[in-house]
């Protein structure tokens, strides 16, 4: 059986961002395509039950918010916990319009966070993506939330976990995990291209099954850091 993490070549974050740039400049709706793929994976992994979405700043959180809105419009019970003071405005607006409550993590103590996760069928990790420029380790409220949820998601019968693009706390290029506060994903839905960090180092074991959502990136001029088995 092939390694589920090696479904595609793994590229560096800088090459992926460079491939995204011309599409974004041309007005391509990359986030909408990514969010649809994320929502599809959520339905497949957990067809029923409440969904808890963890959202940080930036586009990774935007993908998660748009997916939350899509699931809520279909009738799923969805709640968002934001770990950053500011989150993706358009994504948040769509989530709120779909009836999704957004709660700031600093309003919830650790026991309450654990209780919310325990009552959920699925946790979506949209805290950090590939835009992290230094250490991928979670900090502040993001780290506290993940630390509070870890015993719940790793317990027998705990909720399933989907990572948005890459598990928060995993190095995109090398798979490094400098801090143990990382939610182990059952599925990682990655966008545009495989991330090398999903395919090597400690990150490989935390990624679970990797599903690639094609958003039309041209990486023909980039050299993969990790090559998939052919």
UniProtKB/Swiss-Prot annotation:
The YjeF N-terminal domain extends over 11-223
Q: What's its catalytic activity?
A: (6R)-NADHX = (6S)-NADHX; (6R)-NADPHX = (6S)-NADPHX
Cofactor(s) needed by this chain: K(+)
Q: Where does (6S)-NADPHX bind?
A: 59-63, 129-137, 165
Q: Which InterPro entries match?
A: YjeF_N_dom (IPR004443), YjeF_N_dom_sf (IPR036652)
> Which GO terms label this protein's molecular function in UniProt?
metal ion binding; NAD(P)HX epimerase activity; nucleotide binding
UniProt entry keywords in alphabetical sequence: Isomerase, Metal-binding, NAD, NADP, Nucleotide-binding, Potassium
Give the enzyme class: isomerase
Note the Pfam families from the entry. YjeF_N
Q: EC?
A: 5.1.99.6
Q: How is the cofactor bound?
A: Binds 1 potassium ion per subunit.
Binding annotation for K(+): 60, 125, 168
Query: What HAMAP family does this protein's entry cite?
Result: NADHX_epimerase
What family does the entry list? Answer: Belongs to the NnrE/AIBP family.
Q: What does this protein do?
A: Catalyzes the epimerization of the S- and R-forms of NAD(P)HX, a damaged form of NAD(P)H that is a result of enzymatic or heat-dependent hydration. This is a prerequisite for the S-specific NAD(P)H-hydrate dehydratase to allow the repair of both epimers of NAD(P)HX.
Protein name (Swiss-Prot/TrEMBL): NAD(P)H-hydrate epimerase
What organism does the record attribute this protein to?
A: Clavibacter michiganensis subsp. michiganensis (strain NCPPB 382)
């Amino acid at each position: 059986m092939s390694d589920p993490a090696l479904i595609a070549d793994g590229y560096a974050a800088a090459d992926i961002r460079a491939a995204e740039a011309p599409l974004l400049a041309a007005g391509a709706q990359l986030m909408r395509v990514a969010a649809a793929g994320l929502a599809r994976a959520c339905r497949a992994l957990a067809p029923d039950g409440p969904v808890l979405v963890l959202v940080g700043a930036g586009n990774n959180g935007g993908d998660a918010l748009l997916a939350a809105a899509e699931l809520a419009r279909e009738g799923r019970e969805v709640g968002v916990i934001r770990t950053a003071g500011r989150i993706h405005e358009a994504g948040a607006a769509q989530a709120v319009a779909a009836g999704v409550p957004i709660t700031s993590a600093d309003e919830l103590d650790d026991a309450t966070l654990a209780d919310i996760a325990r009552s959920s069928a699925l946790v979506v990790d949209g805290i950090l993506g590939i835009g992290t420029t230094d250490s991928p380790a979670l900090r502040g409220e993001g780290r506290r939330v993940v630390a509070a949820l870890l015993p719940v998601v790793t317990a027998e019968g705990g909720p399933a976990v989907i990572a948005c693009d890459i598990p928060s706390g995993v190095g995109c290029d090398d798979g490094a995990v400098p801090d143990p506060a990382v939610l182990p994903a059952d599925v990682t839905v990655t966008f545009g291209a495989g991330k090398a960090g999903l395919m090597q180092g400690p990150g490989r074991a935390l990624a679970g099954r990797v599903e690639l959502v094609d958003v039309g990136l041209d990486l023909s001029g980039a050299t993969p850091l990790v090559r998939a088995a052919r």
